[in-house]
Amino acid sequence: MDYLLTSPSSLRFSDFISSIPKETDHKWLRFSVNLGDARRSTRTRITCGAISSRRKLAERESAERENRVLVRSLMSRISDREPLVKTLDKYVKVVRCDHCFLLFEELGKSDKWLQCLEVFRWMQKQRWYIPDNGVYSKLISVMGKKGQTRMAMWLFSEMKNSGCRPDASVYNALITAHLHTRDKAKALEKVRGYLDKMKGIERCQPNVVTYNILLRAFAQSGKVDQVNALFKDLDMSPVSPDVYTFNGVMDAYGKNGMIKEMEAVLTRMRSNECKPDIITFNVLIDSYGKKQEFEKMEQTFKSLMRSKEKPTLPTFNSMIINYGKARMIDKAEWVFKKMNDMNYIPSFITYECMIMMYGYCGSVSRAREIFEEVGESDRVLKASTLNAMLEVYCRNGLYIEADKLFHNASAFRVHPDASTYKFLYKAYTKADMKEQVQILMKKMEKDGIVPNKRFFLEALEVFGSRLPGSGSENRKSTRSSRSRDSPKGRGGNQLTEFQDKDNKHVFRAVQDCRKNYLENLSGHDKGSRDESRKPSQEKQPLFASDQNNMMIKEKKELFTRVL
């Protein structure tokens, strides 16, 4: 693979053609060379003609496939031993801007946003690099999805310093980055200011994507007045709303249970002569089902069957799970039969919905039958399917059966993941199964599952809910008395709350799990501890190799404060 990517034979004439701008419509000289035996003379056929659009599309798709192959090769070589920049230097003659874009996507999916910045710094050192809004927009989007709003703001200022003038796509990425923060009220105020700022810049006029992002965000927060104001602003602007605009707002309203507001948006959609698509029908069916307005849900499904659109698997999955929550087992089974009659192949999500549906209805044996049918089939059983069956057992009070299934998961060729451990930990703790909690912690350590911050916070929440007098009306008094009465020192606050031996015993298991977690973190950064002390690296914490160590140190301090 390495030879093919770097050898001269990989530099084909098609790659040269694909690099020509799409707008040109020139006639190119095409060669067709037939290579025969070494003794025979080489025959060359020269033809002139316009390259068809179909051939251009095929060459473009071929180039994209080659780019993804190279990016996958680069991603497979990323490790702690070999830095990413060193790997990029090996392919410096091949890697270009398109490959870096794909690298940003792959690194962002795997939570390696720091390495995105390393790739960006490496790009800036190359001769072919030209500051471009697309690069900054992509990086800002990746940083926003990972909650790194400050880094997104730094990239925005860096873009302006490099000579690039921001456009609507950059502001859209910046708005999305702010909306990923935890303080939604402050974020909404901030993005509203960005919208006003965009209106004052000629080349940054808000487009339909801008309004789609803002409308969905305000609808999710339940701010109906702001949504109506944005729709009014949209009607006065030259931008026309599309089906994605209405679908996003209706989905946000529907998930918040705001049915009247959702129907008002549907009326506005019809008045704008915007035809609903399958996403529109799925949003309506799911929203009505969650509010248990099944008459409207069934009417919407009938309208879908009469329309040109065809139902999808999410359509049936939503109806099955919502009927199950209402304990309407006959109608849920009718939907599953209807799906099979229409020659739809159930996915693993469909089977999980059926398992959960029977669990809601109390038919544990039928849920177990479906689980075993999926396990015995050729399908690869997923951890989410195992989690669904475990939840059915725990929901119906069968904790022993859930524990047996968990320990016999290997018989079904499925391995529990971190979500499995988190769910069982909460279930065992609420059921006061202290012995199972200890066994679960040991197996968690044995399987190499490292708990994160959310796991510890939820563990403390479960412990707090099991304390006597831990209702919502007594929480404030508990917090105030905790600071006065509890002794100082690490762990002193928690040990005074759990006076009985059983709670101390279970809480000690959580502390042991936290200790192992910190030991894993300390072993991770032990090899690069000396490098992190260099003064030269302290001056550049943004792209230095010790940035990861700084994050790990912050996590250690956070867990120490939490527990």
From Swiss-Prot:
GO terms for biological process: embryo development ending in seed dormancy. GO terms for molecular function: mRNA binding. Transmembrane segments: none annotated. Residues 1-47 form a transit peptide. GO terms for cellular component: chloroplast. Pfam families: PPR (PF01535), PPR_2 (PF13041). PPR repeats lie at residues 132-166, 167-197, 207-241, 242-276, 277-311, 312-346, 347-381, 382-416, 417-451. Residues 468-501, 520-551 are annotated as: Disordered. Keywords: Chloroplast, Plastid, Repeat, Transit peptide. The keyword Thylakoid does not apply. It is found in: Plastid, Chloroplast. Residues 520-537 have a biased composition (Basic and acidic residues). Gene3D superfamilies: Tetratricopeptide repeat domain. The keyword rRNA-binding does not apply. Disruption phenotype: Embryonic lethality due to embryo development arrest at early globular stage. Essential for embryo development. Belongs to the PPR family. P subfamily. NCBIfam families: PPR. This is Pentatricopeptide repeat-containing protein At4g39620, chloroplastic.
